[in-house]
Amino acid sequence: MILGQLTEIQNLVSIWIVLMTAVAILCFIVSEITRNYSQVDKLWSLMPIVYSWITSAIFPSSRVFIMSSLVTVWGLRLSYNFSRKGGYNIIPWKGEEDYRWKVMRENSLLKGRLRFGLFNFFFISFYQNILILLFSSPLLMAAGNQDKPLTIIDLLAGVFMLTFIIIESIADNQLFRFHQEKNRGENESRRYKKSLRKGFMTEGLWKYVRHPNFTAEQLIWICFYFFGVAASGQWINFSLTGAILLILLFIGSSQLTEGISSRKYPEYSIYRKEIPGFIPWKFFPPAKNE
């Protein structure tokens, strides 16, 4: 029984890896042909859903079903947000490209067709697809322990994950409305007048941290990791790698974004000094000295 289940897990991992490799190669080829390097961005919110339901079909259990359902809610919401910003197009390989890839193409270390092509192959197309697979990997822990009953850890992980999905949705909606008002250039009936004067978002959840949507996204996948903890009984297991690498990616991404904003908006450096990046530590009450 144990050997049979191990073989099934190995087969599932093989399916994931083959699928991930095929998608990465496709993203590389399409992005090189079209010069639109946001092909992985289009699939970022969709691939975890695919991994989830493949796992659920092969290893049906209450835990895997709950995890797959939460990932589907997360993915559909994020896909909707990406779509309304112009990320998807009726022609699949078209759509809005993330402005940061254009900035990266102008970087002296990456400038040139060959250099950026290598960066596209190793980082944009392959590393990011590997990362998606890794932060989805708590599903493998749940699949390998499908007979383990649900615990209080599952309940807490599910409640907090759903909470952070809602927070991320609020943050994304606030930012989307801000950019709508900014693009319309209206002078009346504007919700984010203070932010519009500065040119960047400083209201709503942005009063507390500079990247509330990034904070929520990282916490979503940390919560997801705890389903694997509940299934395996191991507080530290291999699936933690995905959450850690995702956090590192967001740290690097936010630094790139903030560098661009600092050059573009004179007041951004002040905002950067006054408001925390991810954790609203500044708004916690200070400890009292005895």
Could you say what each language-model-derived stretch is?
Residues 97-147, 158:
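PAPS-dependent sulfotransferase catalytic domain
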Residues 35, 39-50, 86-121, 199-206, ...:
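Juxtamembrane helix-capping/reentrant segments at transmembrane boundaries
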Residues 39, 126, 209:
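Generic enzyme active-site microenvironment
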Residues 25-32:
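Transmembrane-helix signature of polytopic, lipid-linked glycan biosynthesis machinery
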Residues 1-10, 111-112:
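Juxtamembrane membrane-interface segments at transmembrane-helix boundaries in membrane proteins
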Residues 6-24, 47-82, 88, 129-174, ...:
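Hydrophobic transmembrane alpha-helices
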